From Swiss-Prot:
PANTHER family: NICOTINATE-NUCLEOTIDE ADENYLYLTRANSFERASE-RELATED, PHOSPHOPANTETHEINE ADENYLYLTRANSFERASE. Catalyzes the reversible adenylation of nicotinate mononucleotide (NaMN) to nicotinic acid adenine dinucleotide (NaAD). It comes from the Bacteria. This is Probable nicotinate-nucleotide adenylyltransferase. Belongs to the NadD family. It catalyses: nicotinate beta-D-ribonucleotide + ATP + H(+) = deamido-NAD(+) + diphosphate. It comes from Bacillus cereus (strain ATCC 10987 / NRS 248). SUPFAM superfamilies: Nucleotidylyl transferase (SSF52374).
Length: 189
């Protein structure tokens, strides 16, 4: 059975924290690859102004293109409405019955697991992998595999705020992503 990691998110923008988490879990669990799963509309972010799918996808491609064990999975982008992990993983497990999926989540999402849509059924489809995130614990009533990663306190919301305030984001996200953001005037207001 193949072992594949999945890291979902809006990736608005993708940053070194996402890449660090994916790479650390890839090595710690001896995965075949890690798939980045950009959301259409995450249920917990409905109503927030999210950068276009096209721009988020382009930035994610730029961020991951140099790692042969990273891929982008477009499963959620093909659907309209909220992106529920259960629906996505049900589709992916049907398409790839030979794969054991390891769904990678940060401490913020570990704490939120009791509120996830169809969590009990989702546990039959994936192994959750929790990684520590500053300010959050990995305590949950659900079974998760934990992977220790070096602390890197950066988030997409922090980066959007820094761009809005015209502060440097150098060394926080890949240079190609920075160039794309600046050329397209993203996060300026």
């Amino acid at each position: 059975m193949r072992k594949i990691g999945i890291i979902g998110g809006t990736f608005d923008p993708p940053h070194y924290g996402h890449l660090l988490i994916a790479n650390e879990v890839y090595h710690a669990l001896n995965l075949e690859e890690v798939w980045f799963l950009p959301n259409q509309i995450p249920p917990h972010k409905q109503g927030r102004n999210i950068t276009s799918v096209e721009s988020r996808l382009q930035m994610l491609e730029l961020a991951t293109e140099e790692e042969e064990h990273f891929s982008i999975c477009l499963e959620e982008l093909s659907r309209k409405g909220p992106s529920y992990t259960y629906d996505t993983m049900l589709q992916l497990t049907k398409k790839h019955p030979d794969v054991q999926f390891h769904f990678i989540i940060g401490g913020d999402m570990v704490e939120y697991l009791p509120k996830w849509y169809n969590i009990e059924m989702l546990l039959n489809l994936v192994t959750f992998v929790g990684v520590a995130r500053p300010g959050y614990t990995l305590h949950t009533p659900y079974p998760i595999t934990t992977v220790e990663i070096p602390e890197f306190a950066v988030s997409s919301s922090l980066l959007r705020e820094r761009y809005k305030e015209k502060k440097t984001c150098k060394y926080l996200l890949p240079e190609k992503v920075q160039v794309y953001i600046e050329r397209n005037g993203l996060y300026e207001s």
